[in-house]
Regions:
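Conserved hydrophobic/aromatic packing and binding residues within compact polymer-binding modules
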Residues: 7, 21-22, 32-35, 61
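Short, Lys/Arg-enriched C-terminal cap helix and immediately downstream tail that follows
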Residues: 8, 44-45
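Short basic helix-loop element that most often maps to the first helix and adjoining turn
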Residues: 5-24
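Short, charged recognition helix plus adjacent turn
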Residues: 62-69
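DNA major-groove recognition helix of helix-turn-helix/homeodomain DNA-binding modules
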Residues: 45-60
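Recognition helix of helix-turn-helix/homeodomain-like DNA-binding domains
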Residues: 27-40, 66
């Protein structure tokens, strides 16, 4: 699982829309969409807030393996 897929899965687990996640991170819905489609990656300044939001360590977020449901 790549980072974009992981962000998508985590967002869905939290029942957040792309717009809601974008609002929480102060980025646009389009930015979230690009992250999820691996067209771009989050800046380092957004990695920590993403981890905080999903209650993960940076290592857990950046690992490329299946998320347990």
């Amino acid at each position: 699982m790549n980072l974009g897929e992981k962000i998508y899965e985590l967002r869905k687990q939290q029942n957040l829309s792309q717009e809601e996640l974008g609002d929480k991170l102060n980025v646009s819905r389009q930015t979230i969409s690009k992250w999820e489609r691996n067209e771009s990656t989050p800046d380092l300044a957004k990695i920590v807030p993403l981890c905080d939001l999903f209650n993960l360590s940076v290592d857990e977020l950046l690992q490329v393996k299946k998320i347990e449901k």
